[in-house]
Amino acid sequence: MKLIYTEMSYSMTEILVNEARKAADQGYRVFYIAPNSLSFEKEREVLTLLPERGTFSIIVTRFVQMSRYFTVESSPSKQHLDDTTLAMIFYRALMQLKPEDLPSYGRLQNNSVFIEQLVELYKELKNAQLSVHDLTGLDHPQKQEDLIKIIELAETIMIQQDYNQDSPLQSFARAIKLGLLNNQLSKTVIVIDGFSRFSAEEDYLLSLLNNNCQEVIIGSYVSQKAYQKSFIKGNIYEASLHFLQDLAQKYHIKPVFATSNQVFKPAFSRLTQLFEATHDFSQVDWQLQKNDLDHFSLWQCHHQKEEIEHVAKSIRQKLYEGYRYKDILVLLGDMDAYQLQIGPIFDKFEIPYYLGKAEPMAAHPLVQFIESLERSQRYNWRREDILNMLKSGLFGCFDDSDIDRFEEYTQFADIKGFTKFSKPFTINSSRQYPLDFLNEMRQDIVLPLQELFKSQKQLGASLIDKLILFLEKIRLAENMQGLAQSQLEVEKNEEVWKRFTDILTSFHHIFGQEKLRLSDCLALIKTGMKSAQYRVVPATLDVVTIKSYDLVQPHSKPFVYAIGLTQSHFPKQIHHSGLLSDQERARINEIRNYRHFDIASAENSKKNHQTALSLFNAATKELVLSVPTVINETFDDLSPYLKELINFGLPLLDKGKNYLSYDNSDIGNYKALLSQIIAINRQDLIEMSDQDKMFWTVVLRYLRKQLRKQQLELPTSDYRLSTKPLSKEVIEVCFPKGIPLKLSATALTVFYNNQYNYFLKYVLNLNKTESIHPDSRIHGQYLHRVFERLMKDHTQEPFDNKLKQAIYHTNQESFFQQVYQDNAEAEYSLAILEDIVRSTAPILQLNQNIKVIDQEKNFHLDMGNEILVHGIIDRIDQLSDGSLGIVDYKSSANQFDIGTFYNGLSPQLVTYLAALKQIAPHDINQLFGAMYLHLQDPKLDLVTFKQIDNTLVESIYKALTYKGIFSEVEKEHLSTGAYQTKNALYSNDELETLLNYNKYLYLKAAKHIKKGHFLINPYTSDGKTVQGDQLKAITRFEADLDMAQARRLVTLPAKEKKECFLTLMRKESHL
């Protein structure tokens, strides 16, 4: 064995490549070993350093891959074990154990996290060269007993299913020990680069290779100053020193110092020496030189987005200077925090990148499909799960519009559960859903699912066969192919599909002869899919590499950007959270030789020093270290390592916000510039100098010209809520000439409530989601229907019998049966409605002098100027003197207020009077009024009554009165009925004023509607609060910010309120 060390200013790779070349020139086969995370980059670096740029004699690889070169022909043809397969094996083992067999872990048998921890422990035991029987000295002896039972049973299953329990390194070591590879190894030289420690498995293999190979060469970075130190605790080279010293002591050799021809910039060397002096308690009498600072930058940004944008701009600048993407490396302090943001921002700046991390499959549509399938079976056809399965795009041949229509109907009809999905859809609404089409779609969904879900407990092989048959019926494979929109997505889908088929194969192999329920089968497949990962190789090598900062090696790239280096992430503090504590691992390590657990927490300090040292020397030309003030919406402090650099004299540059400028880094990329123009266009104007204004005016003019060529436009500024008028073409379609504009009292109320609400409801015809469950609208229909039947019954039957018959026949109507007999809640609502009917009906019995002329009367009122008002009058009554009036049933309290009417918010009764005046017979000229009848079950506070007598009855009937507009001429005839005429009597002239002003309201609204410009103007009565519909989710209206846009109602003092409003109406209606 040969141990080599060198200073950070030299290239260890060049030194080891020269050693490898010498061995290759002598005819030896050379394996150049690099860590798993660096083998790809190391291979490119090694080949670059070779004069011939390639050779068959030197193979750059990893330990695991090297073992396959030697054992590929002799290794037994057994099944491969991966993490998903291991999890399934442990699940099967736990199935065979009873809870009482596992005193410590019996309650966790079906816990997926516990199974994952078992998998991790098993892998750790293999890497540590330990067996489960070596787990002595645990905090609780029962833990070891339980683990022995579980792992031994799992290993028995592995043997039965012909799985290879040995790792590739174990198989390699066994072959070496048996002397099967002596001839090959005698002609082999092993070169090892980039390691600062070995696992127990690698350590054991290295001892065998050292005895059988021609030579083993290991290199590491250690300064001569540190190598000569006797006390190395806390030294930045502590990890490498321990590594070399342990090897030197074990193999009885002395490490040698070497140098390379390539010497890196002195600035990095001087920074390293200052860093080393800080941690070895020595002093230096010099500081960084001024030109050294050109190679380092310390940035501070407010948050992650700004930080990434600054990096992207700097990368674009480097490209402008002639460098390539492959010359740049981006390191992340927190991979999870930055992974989701860095992609879209780099795409915006058109920077191709490769993220050196396996992607989880959890977000892929195939995983969402499997999860929805499992949940549909487990939760008995829950609607959300069925719809999620359809929306994955992998179930059947349904368009998005078909799925939307199916979803809308199932929400309306409240379809959930197998019983409702299995029955034909028969319920319809005013929207007239296409039931024939929906039922065909229902069958296409239900039949294959029903065939799969009815599977009973059976062999796993049979369940897999049925699952595959189901997937074929729904055309899963074909739909998977149709998902991809780009070559990259095709490659990702291929990797996901491969993992899916591997999981199905493993399940078939492990559970093929085990009896399982379908729910367990789907749950296992779902768990395997959600925990699986895949990796896609970039299509080109000229990309910016992105990876975690703790995987970096010295002298990786010319330009390195390390971001997210906050106190919480730099240095990293790693702790185990598995089935064994670090203390238990340490006790096990004390009694083992060549076999030991890796305890990350015990090596945090020296590993972090090693990582910081590698990071500070990662670049060969320029290193940028950046820290955000806020990361993951949490404030964080500077890293202690960055504070050391500040003490060395490196300035901390506050990058601030990404203000627009005309530097190359800001305007050098068209796509990024366009996005910034859009961003500033959405904000309030910022202060600019005259020169800045002139520059951006020219740029904006140029961009608009380019956008017009592409038929695009910049969005308008929305710092104030504003709306655009409809185009002439749209106005002609919505309000064609020659066809009267149709309005109603409800539509007019909506218009004066908020014009934009009218636009949404009556121009765009947007409606709220319907539901079969009874709401206020359906309750009103029921009450109307009962009273309509009651008032049509002119038989001599007692009133109470008539009422019972009306309720009975209404309840028997198919629509109300479907609505009110669907569940207990609906039946309770029906009981309350029946009580309301019984409570309100007596008012009809009292007014015997009333004759009902008509009910549910449709009308069409011509207002002139091509305006047609339509509606339905609930009831038309006639008094004994022949005068007519209208009654409108209400399920909530209503009464006519002249101020509300004046402001356009209560035109219903006056509109009905106008309609009645038009449709009344010619011999009837007098109208006695228009009124509301509140259908209610009066509630009385008995505490206020001293005794139960006639006063109580009078109070009930006092609540059951007609309230509205009444003619003063008919006062005598109204006095004997249940009419609340106080402050509600109007003379014929006043009634005519109301009718004229009502017409004015319609004409005024119609004129505005036909212009096609609808304002966002909910009304306010006091100028402080907004009572109108604000539609916040659509308009983003905020009362405190947009009060100026609200329509202020006209309000008058209560004294002489009626006369003042009538005066205003006469003035406005005669303009």
Curated annotation (Swiss-Prot):
Cofactor(s), by name: Mg(2+)
Alphabetically ordered keywords of this record: ATP-binding, DNA damage, DNA repair, DNA-binding, Exonuclease, Helicase, Hydrolase, Nuclease, Nucleotide-binding
Pfam families assigned: ADDB_N (PF21445), PDDEXK_1 (PF12705)
Transmembrane region(s): none
EC number: 3.1.-.-
GO terms (BP aspect): double-strand break repair via homologous recombination
Molecular functions per Gene Ontology: 5'-3' exonuclease activity; ATP binding; double-stranded DNA binding; helicase activity; hydrolase activity, acting on acid anhydrides
Function: The heterodimer acts as both an ATP-dependent DNA helicase and an ATP-dependent, dual-direction single-stranded exonuclease. Recognizes the chi site generating a DNA molecule suitable for the initiation of homologous recombination. This subunit has 5' -> 3' nuclease activity but not helicase activity.
Subunit structure: Heterodimer of AddA and RexB.
PANTHER family with a match to the protein in the record: RECBCD ENZYME SUBUNIT RECC
NCBIfam families assigned: rexB_recomb
Family: Belongs to the helicase family. AddB/RexB type 2 subfamily.
Additional record remark: Despite having helicase-like domains, this subunit does not have helicase activity.
Protein name: ATP-dependent helicase/deoxyribonuclease subunit B
Gene source species: Streptococcus pyogenes serotype M12 (strain MGAS2096)
